[in-house]
Curated annotation (Swiss-Prot):
Expressed in the posterior half of each parasegment just anterior to the parasegmental boundary. Residues 94-104, 419-430 have a biased composition (Low complexity). This is Fork head domain transcription factor slp2. Residues 338-366 have a biased composition (Pro residues). GO terms for biological process: regulation of transcription by RNA polymerase II; segment polarity determination. Its main location: nucleus. It is found in: Nucleus. One of its GO terms (cellular component) is nucleus. Residues 162-179 have a biased composition (Basic and acidic residues). Keywords: Developmental protein, DNA-binding, Nucleus, Segmentation polarity protein, Transcription, Transcription regulation. The gene is slp2.
Length: 451
């Protein structure tokens, strides 16, 4: 930045002006008059360029070029304003734009050339990033519709699992020419356990199987054993079983989890896959039906629980017998109503010889909770009391029938109906023979004892 002081002679001003021009941008050899007039038209050219830069570009996307040049040119504009303030009216205004073609740094073509790399950078573009190799395709995406819980069963989280193929697409080979098997560590572990005689192996047994069947790992022992241990610990398909104290040897056994029955090894990827989830879901639903169906018959009122209650007839009856044995307070389902015992009214009433059964209570409309279980317990106690009262009434009726049959053995008289009830009138005169006293006092004695 050149500072021009007032009071300097015109020759010094021209020298400073020439120094200003040659310091910033070299010019071709011109006359002294053009050198004196060049600084001010340059400022006008900068103003025109700033206006051109501020004009919005007719593009569909936002460009960084509309931001960065404006900030740079604001700084140049401030410098020119300072120069113009300190040198007022020293140079006559020249509206000739011939210097636009002579200056290299004031041409709009050079300015556009400098901003071309920036204008190509689109900030707001929603286009995806370029793919490194479009020919590469993830094999997991092909089998995605057939795979479920793949991360859970085949999580390659180890650093020792290298690529099975080199950069040129050929299989990886060691110094002896042994190819690396196209299987993941989880697949190797599953093959080792499934092909064992007892369906279980120790860690050393898994190592031995891998090195025996795949010589590549026998000759290259760099980190793959640590990866095997890592996958055994993290994968849910493998379960650690402690060794029995009578079993000699060291280390725990590793077995396959029962949920890994549908897991197989993919032929194209060499990783673990689940065959179909429909079979596993059907087995899980059948298991839930076998558990929930017999225990909660009141859920039949809910249509959303129908799938759990319509269990097949091949469900084990042992579960129902154990439920009846260990849960005596749960009501037994009858043919008429599933939640009440057969042949009993809904609410306990006074015992009667031939009382009609009361109306059945409304069906269960709520899933069993703790309060409902408590109500069932109270209801069961009431049922026991009602059953005891009904048994006592039946016993009394049986005794009365026995007394009536015993009283009907003598010749029939007019007093026999009264005797059957138990009222034996005493003959005041004693002239009537009267029945035998033993049948008369037998029902009275039995009734008084039970009462």
């Amino acid at each position: 930045m050149v500072k021009i002081e007032e009071g300097l002679p015109s020759s010094e001003i021209s020298a400073h002006s020439l120094h200003f021009q040659h310091h910033h941008h070299p010019l071709p050899p011109t006359t002294h008059h053009s050198a004196l007039q060049s600084p001010h038209p340059v400022g006008l050219n900068l103003t025109n360029l700033m206006k051109m830069a501020r004009t919005p570009h007719l593009k569909s996307s936002f460009s960084i070029n509309s931001i960065l040049p404006e900030t740079v040119e604001h700084h140049d504009e401030d410098e020119e304003e300072d120069v113009e303030k300190k040198s007022p009216a020293k140079f006559p205004p020249n509206h000739n734009n011939n210097n636009l073609n002579t200056t290299n740094w004031g041409s709009p073509e050079d300015h556009e050339a400098e901003s071309d790399p920036e204008s190509d950078l689109d900030v707001t573009s929603m286009s995806p990033a370029p793919v490194a190799n479009p020919n590469e395709s993830d094999p997991d995406e092909v089998d995605e519709e057939f795979v479920e819980e793949d991360i859970e069963c085949d999580g390659e989280t180890t650093d020792g699992d290298a690529e099975n193929k080199s950069n040129d697409g050929k299989p990886v080979k060691d110094k002896k020419g042994n190819e690396k098997p196209p299987y993941s560590y989880n697949a190797l572990i599953m093959m080792a356990i499934r092909q064992s005689s007892e369906k279980r192996l120790t860690l050393n047994g898994i190592y031995e199987y891998i090195m025996t069947n795949h010589p590549y790992y026998r000759d290259n022992k760099q980190g793959w054993q640590n990866s095997i241990r890592h996958n055994l610990s993290l994968n849910k398909c493998f379960v650690k079983v402690p060794r029995h104290y009578d079993d000699p040897g060291k280390g725990n056994y590793w077995m396959l989890d029962p949920s890994a029955e549908d897991v197989f090894i993919g032929g194209s990827t060499g990783k673990l896959r689940r065959r179909t989830t429909a079979a596993s879901r059907s087995r899980l639903a059948a298991f839930k039906r076998s558990l929930i169906g017999p225990m909660f018959p009141g859920l039949a009122a809910y249509p959303q629980f129908g799938q759990f209650l319509t269990y097949p007839p091949t469900a084990p009856s042992l579960l129902a017998s154990m439920y009846q044995r260990y849960n005596p307070f749960a009501p037994k389902g009858g043919p008429g109503h599933p939640g009440l015992p057969p042949g009993l009214p809904g609410l306990p009433g006074p015992p009667g010889p031939q009382g009609p059964p009361g109306p059945p209570p409304p069906p269960f409309v709520a899933p069993p909770t703790s309060s409902e279980l408590y109500q069932r317990l109270q209801y069961q106690q009431l049922l026991h009391q009602h059953a005891a009262a009904a048994a006592l009434a039946a016993h009394q009726r049986q005794l009365s029938v026995a007394a009536a049959s015993a009283a009907s053995q003598p010749p029939p008289t007019h007093h026999h109906p009264h005797l059957a009830v138990g009222q034996a009138p005493l003959s005041p005169g004693g002239d009537s023979p009267g029945p035998s006293p033993q049948p008369l006092h037998k029902p009275v004695t039995v009734v008084s004892r039970n009462s």
